[in-house]
Amino acid sequence: DAYDAGPGVALTLGVGSATVGSTLNGYFQSYVTAHTRNSVAVTAPNLNTQGAASAGAGYELTVAANFTEEVTAINGGQSDFKITGGRFDLFLDKSPDYSFGGDSGFTNDGSILTGTVVGGGGNFTTFPFFSFGGALIDIQIDSYDPDVFSPDTIASGLSVFTLQITPNNANFLAGVSSVLGHPYTASSDLLVVADGNLDLYAVPEPLSLLLVGSVGAGLLVLRRLRG
């Protein structure tokens, strides 16, 4: 199974003043636009992708995640860090109402897939005209809705979440002042736009989440730790 996410927002706090040993907190939220199975689109006429801009009919699938990281090295424009914790949730909301500008509607109703971030690491590099970075984050799946996901797939499958990062999308970010309740301060924080998709495979592999981003391109891969 594959779930394609629309443009989302990722916020990392305190980037501007970070030093070696600093602990930073990050947050991400988005919504699912399509579902495919064996590379074939699954008909989902009731999947609402318009959020608060719609009449609220059908249902929506939203993603909410948080993570903590410790800066381990700074060398010029490059910062290295290790991931120390966090959480990932996929929500099924029967009253579509997500809003990036209102920072609301992403965690309504129940989570159908929940995971705990248990480790990882990566780096972020800034150049005069572009930036790129990446992280490998290990996630333990804690729970899932068996009415939505096959138990065999959840028990031993491989999940891959790819994410394209476009941090200079000023029009999209213009109305965003917070993510998951955490205010954005331009002078100290990093706020980016991100597109992604979640792939679920029935393959016995550990689950980890790899984030490789650049201005305009990036990759976020999620591989599940066997429970």
Regions found by a protein language model. Give the residues of each.
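Extracytosolic secretory-pathway proteins
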Residues: 1-202
